Amino acid sequence: MQVLHVCSEMFPLLKTGGLADVIGALPAAQIAEGIDTRVLLPAFPDIRRGVVDAQVVTRRDTFAGRITLLYGHFNGVGIYLIDAPHLYDRPGSPYHDTNQHAYPDNVLRFALLGWVGSEMASGLDPFWRPDVVHAHDWHAGLTPAYLAARGRPAKSVFTVHNLAYQGMFYSWHMNDIELPWSFYNMHGLEFNGQISFLKAGLYYADHITAVSPTYAREITEPQYAYGMEGLLRQRHHEGRLSGILNGVDDGIWSPQNDLLLPMRYDRDTLEEKAENKRQLQIAMGLKVDDKAPLFAVVSRLTSQKGLDLVLEALPGLLEQGGQLALLGAGDPVLQEGFLAAAAEHPGKVGVQIGYHEAFSHRIMGGADVILVPSRFEPCGLTQLYGLKYGTLPLVRRTGGLADTVADSSLENLADGLATGFVFEDSNALSLLRAIRRAFVLWSRPSLWRYVQRQAMNMDFSWQVAANSYRELYQRLM
């Protein structure tokens, strides 16, 4: 079976979010399962530099200008690159300029990605043709539409990593992207009077997956679906919508092998984690105190991630003797709020604005609790890293957080199921109650250690996900 992933980023070449982590790990896991898997990406500068052995496959004139299709390898995975410097050779973010304005030609930049994905199924590379084209998020959303226009030369899967980003463009762009105008209607890619790349993926794909079973259910409800609930409910009834949990890349996230940690450890040597905590406290300007539970945030600072709740609950957390270490960037109001809290509580709150992959490992290896209080969370990887590192996740019961973390309730403790702390309602009071439960467990060190071991025992490997995708592909064939 031959599978092509169509997407816009891939860790470690280029990463703006969790999508990159998935594409950095899933194809390799699928290859290990015996599936001939390749990836198609735009040749953004960082990606182009990383695929050093890229050779020309073909050149084409397209609606978006002249392109060269390249093929090379990265970490044992075959990578196709769409080399179109006039579209992709820009510094910084792949999606917007330095002023955070979306590039005005994004409609062409990402329509081209979908078009090439579809053409691959029609022999664009004469030596390799996919049986399944697997597109990810709105950037690749037109892939299933182009396949439909082509008479469906391959089966298509569309994975929703985050339904909030919809890829909306003015309707007149139908003239620019070489899709029939008949596709522009309610039963197609029209949404609120515009073209939606996301809806194109949802409507035309043979099967839709969400990145967790709970998120797959949630997106059939209005509060999570951003207006797509009718279509998603229909796909659910047709058996064409399912949830497959993301995994964790053991090669990158594993406390016993993590070279970014001052001290490596596993579930049988958890006492070594204390040195990581000490070094993290020093690095973040916190008081070195092994008795104070160290809560951490590694996140984009947005209201989706519920970080306003952390700011609101922070006085209660500090009053009980806790510390906070935060690494993240985003909403300027939240950034200012956390910086002000750090200034007001020296030695108790440490804040680093920005994102540093290496430092996120040090936080995961040194903190006691990782906070993930999201309003919605399709899958979430942060809590999975927390589980792997024995850094107990404190999460809201939504999306993938609900599927992966079991609350340390008395029943779950008795049944050996507890792996963290879970709260229900998206408000500071509910969050504070979960924080209180964390303090109570912290006061019982042997019980805390027991829950850490439970957490580290969970299996969220990519092999599990790769197997689930293989079963899905086989059903479609």
Swiss-Prot record:
NCBIfam families the record matches: glgA, PRK00654.1-2
Function per UniProt: Synthesizes alpha-1,4-glucan chains using ADP-glucose.
HAMAP family named among the record's database cross-references: Glycogen_synth
Protein name in the entry: Glycogen synthase
Catalysis: reaction(s): [(1->4)-alpha-D-glucosyl](n) + ADP-alpha-D-glucose = [(1->4)-alpha-D-glucosyl](n+1) + ADP + H(+)
Binding-site positions, ADP-alpha-D-glucose: K15
Pathway terms, separated by semicolons: Glycan biosynthesis; glycogen biosynthesis
InterPro entries, alphabetized: Glyco_trans_1, GS/SS, Starch_synth_cat_dom
Main EC class the enzyme belongs to: transferase
Family designation: Belongs to the glycosyltransferase 1 family. Bacterial/plant glycogen synthase subfamily.
Keywords: Glycogen biosynthesis, Glycosyltransferase, Transferase
GO biological-process terms attached to the record: glycogen biosynthetic process
EC id: 2.4.1.21
Keyword Transferase on entry: yes
GO molecular function: alpha-1,4-glucan glucosyltransferase (ADP-glucose donor) activity; alpha-1,4-glucan glucosyltransferase (UDP-glucose donor) activity
GO CC, alphabetical: cytosol
Endoplasmic reticulum among keywords: no
